[in-house]
Amino acid sequence: MDQMAKIDEKKPHVVFIPFPAQSHIKCMLKLARILHQKGLYITFINTDTNHERLVASGGTQWLENAPGFWFKTVPDGFGSAKDDGVKPTDALRELMDYLKTNFFDLFLDLVLKLEVPATCIICDGCMTFANTIRAAEKLNIPVILFWTMAACGFMAFYQAKVLKEKEIVPVKDETYLTNGYLDMEIDWIPGMKRIRLRDLPEFILATKQNYFAFEFLFETAQLADKVSHMIIHTFEELEASLVSEIKSIFPNVYTIGPLQLLLNKITQKETNNDSYSLWKEEPECVEWLNSKEPNSVVYVNFGSLAVMSLQDLVEFGWGLVNSNHYFLWIIRANLIDGKPAVMPQELKEAMNEKGFVGSWCSQEEVLNHPAVGGFLTHCGWGSIIESLSAGVPMLGWPSIGDQRANCRQMCKEWEVGMEIGKNVKRDEVEKLVRMLMEGLEGERMRKKALEWKKSATLATCCNGSSSLDVEKLANEIKKLSRN
């Protein structure tokens, strides 16, 4: 209450609503901290379980030095924070069903009870399914959508309604997934040249297995048209033509990435590596890297939601071992179809010589470690923009959501990566790891990655495109809050 006594009720107060997944929370929390540093009050809303996990992993330790920044929670229908035995995607769908039914009333009640009146809402673009825009309208509070993905990912999502209108999707049946139909070039998407249907989010295909996701995607694309302000986690130099096309559709677009580079410039040095993770990060990963030569290690992490079969894990494992390069592999407890990975003993022993296996790590710290020379990734946007910021080339194995579009751009447009086929084979993994770490192609990609690192650094400098857009965003929030 002492802190509340000093509150200036005329100061803008932004309420953040993240999509309840690790990468989205991490991204939105970074922007929230940046805007807090620029003089705005912040309330950040998590589900009960996600906030419990964030606290347990040390993700809120900085809060005592951030007066005017508050966390609030809403129920999620889960009894406790459990990972084991449940596929992350299944748990997420269950959570989305709960929030679609309940979030509207929970949010209204929460906002009306805030001791400082909310003046602006920044909502994850993927959270509109939970009636967030309707809630903002009822409260008469301006809302800004934040797309934590790349411009290419947003444009791919946004085109779902057009693809449906043109009757390209839904696909008629499962045979269309293997009969060459997915190789169709879509040449009319603004800013995306010669992209194939298979490079778009697989949710768009609307097979029986993912029709729920297609409906979510279609609804999300429609609701994007209802707002006048939009934030995208990219930098203009990386996706110039796409950003230009998006700005021709939407009146107010802010490109504010890479967020970590911006955060590094305004937070105290000792807090730059604060965790934003729902998992406990293992310092042993970095300690192991400290003993390795520069550019000698492949970092492997398939993100927080992707799952794979034990067969895929074994193929990746032998491919890494046979490449004869050091590797740091993050294997989550629920990576194998939602269950702990039980690795064959022969592979486990073979991996001990060159590999180090951890359950989670500080990814930005790892990618910026001099020992890391390549990144085998699921192509989640958070991972790609962090890798570009560190100047690290990639191998991509995309799975869900925007990852296919990200991988396509990474390989074809930004020229910093190569794709591993969906059906994982150890020989292909070995070959591509060798190309990445020791071949001319890897050398070329590393040089290109370092060029993008320089561009990202310039974008986040004092007069860089992203720095200027953050200032514009903060000023616009202040303006919206006065109206």
From Swiss-Prot:
UniProt keywords, alphabetically: Glycosyltransferase, Transferase
UniProt keyword Glycosyltransferase, yes or no: yes
Leading EC class: transferase
GO molecular function: quercetin 3-O-glucosyltransferase activity; quercetin 7-O-glucosyltransferase activity
InterPro entries on file: UDP_glucos_trans, UDP_glycos_trans_CS
Highest taxon of the lineage: Eukaryota
Residues that bind UDP-alpha-D-glucose: 304, 360-361, 378-386, 400-403
Pfam families in the record: UDPGT (PF00201)
Entry's EC annotation: 2.4.1.-
UniProt record similarity statement: Belongs to the UDP-glycosyltransferase family.
Record function comment: May glycosylate diterpenes or flavonols in leaves.
Name of the protein in its database record: UDP-glycosyltransferase 85C1
Gene from which the chain derives: UGT85C1
